[in-house]
Design a protein with these regions (language model features):
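Conserved class I S-adenosyl-L-methionine
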Residues: 8-84, 86-95
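SAM-dependent methyltransferase
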Residues: 194-279
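A short glycine-rich, Lys/Arg-flanked "PGG" loop and its adjoining helix->strand segment in the class I
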Residues: 177-189
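A short SAM/SAH-binding and catalytic strip from SAM-dependent methyltransferases
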Residues: 161-175
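Class I SAM-dependent methyltransferase SAM/SAH-binding core
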Residues: 97-151
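C-terminal lobe and adjacent flexible extensions of AdoMet/dcAdoMet transferase-like proteins
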Residues: 270-310
């Protein structure tokens, strides 16, 4: 495996960029070229989830390979107190709707995928939901809604029986305490929430699309933690780097196109310790019920925290 890793590292450190520029617009200032201008711009959290990123997000993250198992584990845990056909679920920060669709496949009563990005939601409605080819009843149980999870007024009191915050959703919130309070307001008594977190010091920050081995983390076979991803796609070259300045973190992405234009974007997170999230949730009224280890879903050092509304 160490030998294969060295081959992979050499391949992706030296491979020439190739492909076509699609879904990327540079800004013409008149002072410098478009490609030069593009190198100076950074897309931040509130800007980067646009049509271009929505179109490539699933290929980059490849969450479709992990979510079926993760969703099944969550629903199995929820089954201890509720039946599938009684669940009214909120998928908070649903993105392109992959997890939303997998929840619907479980035969839940209804599910709303909430996201603040209109572009990601269009992708969810027009691509993910269509490609899923759900039976009519399951398809009709799905709704996607543009809204802010950090605003209590987004939903009514007790509107849902369950909620899920998957992938890095919790880390995008600048006010997790307020978010837990909102969820406590939206979920009726007896309901539950599932919140995905990671061990920020040990989880694998490499994107699945950048790994040379499907379902296998390179972290076990390298002396130093691998924090960079590099992938060659047909239409652009992609690089990413995870940088932890505890408790803050950045995930920086760079897309390079054949016309020499560049798109740079920076995800900023507040990565509190797992015990801090449990404390914040408890302070908002939630009862901590334990966690699900996602190693069986192919994600080491990632966990789903389960909380119950008393």
């Amino acid at each position: 495996l160490n030998y294969l890793y060295l081959i992979w590292e050499d391949k992706y450190s030296n491979k020439a960029y190739s492909g076509l520029n699609e879904g990327f617009t540079t800004i013409n200032t008149g002072a410098i070229t478009d490609s030069e201008e593009s190198k100076l711009i950074w897309y931040e959290n509130d800007q980067l989830f646009d049509d271009f990123y929505a179109s490539v997000y699933d290929n980059l993250t490849q969450l479709a390979g992990r979510y079926p198992q993760e969703v099944s584990l969550i629903v199995h845990h929820w089954n201890k107190t509720a039946k599938n056909d009684s669940m009214e679920i909120l998928d908070c920060g649903c993105g392109t709707g992959i997890a939303t669709v997998f929840f619907a496949r479980q035969g839940v009563k209804s599910i709303i995928g909430l996201d603040i990005s209109n572009a990601m939601l269009r992708r969810a409605r027009n691509v993910t939901l269509v490609a899923a080819k759900l039976p009519t009843e399951q398809k009709e149980s799905v709704r996607f809604l543009e809204g802010d999870m950090n605003m209590e007024s987004t939903f009514a009191a007790g509107q849902f029986s369950h909620a899920a915050l998957l992938f890095f959703t919790i880390y995008y919130s600048n006010d997790p305490s307020g978010l837990f309070k909102n969820l406590f307001y939206w979920i009726r008594p007896g309901g539950q929430i599932a919140v995905e977190v990671v061990n920020k010091y040990k989880f694998d920050p490499m994107l699945e699309s950048a790994s040379p081995f499907v379902g296998l983390s390179l972290q076990k076979y390298t002396k130093d933690r691998v924090t960079k991803s590099k992938v060659e796609f047909d239409k652009f070259s992609y690089e990413a780097e995870f940088d932890l300045s505890d408790p803050d973190a950045e995930f920086r992405e760079t897309f390079r196109f054949p016309d020499k234009s560049i798109r740079r974007q920076r995800h900023t997170f507040t990565m509190r310790d797992i015990k801090d999230f449990i404390h914040l949730a408890s302070a908002a009224g939630w009862k901590y019920d334990g966690y699900i280890d996602l190693i069986t879903a192919g994600f080491e050092y990632a966990y789903v925290l389960i909380f119950t509304h008393p």
